Amino acid sequence: MAASRLDFGEVETFLDRHPELFEDYLMRKGKQELVDKWLQRHSSGQGASDLRPALAGASSLAQSSARGSTGIGGGAGPQGSANSHPASGGGESAGVPLSPSWASGSRGDGNLQRRASQKELRKSFARSKAIHVNRTYDEQVTSRAQEPLSSVRRRALLRKASSLPPTTAHILSALLESRVNLPQYPPTAIDYKCHLKKHNERQFFLELVKDISNDLDLTSLSYKILIFVCLMVDADRCSLFLVEGAAAGKKTLVSKFFDVHAGTPLLPCSTTENSNEVQVPWGKGIIGYVGEHGETVNIPDAYQDRRFNDEIDKLTGYKTKSLLCMPIRNSDGEIIGVAQAINKVPEGAPFTEDDEKVMQMYLPFCGIAISNAQLFAASRKEYERSRALLEVVNDLFEEQTDLEKIVKKIMHRAQTLLKCERCSVLLLEDIESPVVKFTKSFELMSPKCSADAENSFKESVEKSSYSDWLINNSIAELVASTGLPVNVSDAYQDPRFDAEADQISGFHIRSVLCVPIWNSNHQIIGVAQVLNRLDGKPFDDADQRLFEAFVIFCGLGINNTIMYDQVKKSWAKQSVALDVLSYHATCSKAEVDKFKAANIPLVSELAIDDIHFDDFSLDVDAMITAALRMFMELGMVQKFKIDYETLCRWLLTVRKNYRMVLYHNWRHAFNVCQLMFAMLTTAGFQEILTEVEILAVIVGCLCHDLDHRGTNNAFQAKSDSALAQLYGTSATLEHHHFNHAVMILQSEGHNIFANLSSKEYSDLMQLLKQSILATDLTLYFERRTEFFELVSKGAYDWSITSHRDVFRSMLMTACDLGAVTKPWEISRQVAELVTSEFFEQGDRERSELKLTPSAIFDRNRKDELPRLQLEWIDSICMPLYQALVKVNAKLKPMLDSVAANRRKWEELHQKRLQVSAASPVPSSPSPAVAGEDRL
């Protein structure tokens, strides 16, 4: 098969589109000789010679470099070197062609300046080679060259991505980076403009207008205007003053470039903020007069005019003779600046009317250009401020756990945003108190004002400990008490400012901006204050609005951090309380030792395998031994390797965590477990359920009412209790019972499931949760329809997981309601206990919630108990046990007992009706008893 031929042009085009592949290949397999050749071709002869010590291994390059340097030193000069040709036989490396631009920049001795980029390139290449040298494998023998293109590109992209800081702050900064760039149009040369002025004044004027119309940078635009005005009127020097402070009503004329010559470069050599800045008060001097009145001033001799101020001349030694001053207006006719031309050339000549006319024609264009540049600068400033606010939000979301860190971030952002010398944050001790008292203060000084910015960050807990604090406390307290911002442009003129404290501190305060910090509930939690703008100007309205918006986010962040600290302390208190309670809620070692050494009676002796077991036959200790016997009889101790001492401790702790309520107590839990044990052993369900399922239902029976408070789910919802808030209104108590069971199991020395495998443990905990939640009658009503249908159709399949789940749920409910299946005396006694507990709940509903309880909870209607029991049996109990008998006929004694007990309740009900008929008493209709109200 013939190999495909590659076209070099196609390869080059592909590499142009994928430079990262070329870079990756060069970094992996590039040779030093290749880089030497590249440097030789793209550098001067002297530059190649300078590289010789670092690249001594490349002898051919050294020879060619020597020839190149000889030619330069031989007197050919820069011009000759630039036009020299390679020597014959030397190939590409024999001679080094020089660019004419190098000649113009050569030194007087004829030697050329070597480019700095060569040095940097050499360092970069050396670093990359060092990385390759330190590798412990040979890349030539790897299969990287055979990797597909997608793999190479993916690796290159990952390398790029890994070089970026993996923080949200850097990602946000990259996303918010402005994509708007200032247009760059190179102006025509000054010599060309001078030529046009002499030969074509119209074209000269158009060139000046065109050059300023394309510039949106106010600094370079101002510089251009000065130079062009000098050219137009033949002035020796020129100054431009722009109006500032108009919005605040305190106008000032400011010039960042003063006395610019016509022969200076078109771009300023210094861009330092406030460099060469001169401020002229509004209405003062000739500049101020022109700005205030908008008149043109043309003075042949400045010293003859009383408005002239010669202070600048005294400072600079420059003598002002003639002077032409003219206002600059925007499109609305407002004065936005003043242009001043000084000393007409030739020296001593005054400015003419033609000069005035030319300036009057040119300055309107300058006004338009300045307005556009100012608008662009304002939009950029607003963009930067909006970006800073977004970055503040990012900072606040990143740090919400440490108050000191978040306040420090806030102050750093405030200094960056407002460009101030000092920033402080004070937090109130008590936001509810009418007395303003600060409990914490944080302070940060700008690095420009402090040699060590980190050491300038201070925190003090007591107010007396920051007596050296430089912020005026009276202003901060005023803001905290009124909630209104305070902006002081001149601190020493404000009566609220303590000048004496300022002098003692050594930090001179000029201007103060202080705003309140609010939380989400619109309560003042502190104040934020900034001092002294770096440019020396007072804080303006824009600064105040920005600072107030900034502090809104800061207030939320500080409030969240304070709340987190409070929650953290509350959690610590809760942890301590739980530790104390768990100590008192667990059984003692003496109790464990007692039952560990006790002889456990047999099942026959305890009669716990009897479906008609007497619920009141055992005392509290006997119920523990009976529970131990059930675990041993079902083989769970041996099967799951349950430590016997742990089992004793767990049972005793479970008993201790049942409250002393009338019915839902430890005895009820044991009786439910006993009935489950009897059904498993008597009806043969032990053969149907797995060992894990049996363990789950037995443990579930013992734990299904842990920490029951004697009230039902409806009461928790009505009273909006802590349990309802924690678990919601669906199966509130059942979720609490399960979580309480888990807490006991996780306590030290109580995990009876410790020796189960991870899968068995996971399955068991899921089954345990299902078993406990199944005792909620709301869930019973939801699932019993499915169970009844499966039973009636004979479609029960024990291999189907959902069928087994429903069956276990029905078993749990049958055991929970099992008192109705016991002999009449036992069943009636249990019914009276349940009713008494319900009456206590009804009393609480009436007294605490101001509600009228339903019939089953109303003590005043206790004579209706037989009727309510009949409804209870007919609607809830009887259908369930009838279905279970269809599943297993061995459970028929339970159904028979239910029927027998119903007959007893029917007799009592009929007797009540007879008594009521003999002595009729008006009674309100009784409401239907909801199943969930029963348990």
From Swiss-Prot:
Modified residues (Phosphoserine): S162, S163, S239
Class in the EC hierarchy, top level: hydrolase
Native source species: Rattus norvegicus (Rat)
Compositionally biased residues, Low complexity: 54-69
Region (Disordered): 41-125, 915-935
Name listed for the protein in its UniProt record: Dual 3',5'-cyclic-AMP and -GMP phosphodiesterase 11A
Residue sites binding 3',5'-cyclic GMP per the record: S424
Comment on bound cofactor: Binds 2 divalent metal cations per subunit. Site 1 may preferentially bind zinc ions, while site 2 has a preference for magnesium and/or manganese ions.
Record InterPro entries: GAF, GAF-like_dom_sf, HD/PDEase_dom, PDEase, PDEase_catalytic_dom, PDEase_catalytic_dom_sf, PDEase_CS
Family indicated by similarity: Belongs to the cyclic nucleotide phosphodiesterase family.
Record-level GO BP terms: cAMP-mediated signaling; negative regulation of cAMP/PKA signal transduction; negative regulation of cGMP-mediated signaling
Keywords: Allosteric enzyme, cAMP, cGMP, Cytoplasm, Hydrolase, Metal-binding, Phosphoprotein, Repeat
Domains (record comment): The tandem GAF domains bind cGMP, and regulate enzyme activity. The binding of cGMP stimulates enzyme activity.
Start and end residues of each GAF domain: 217-370, 402-558
Residues that bind a divalent metal cation 2: D705
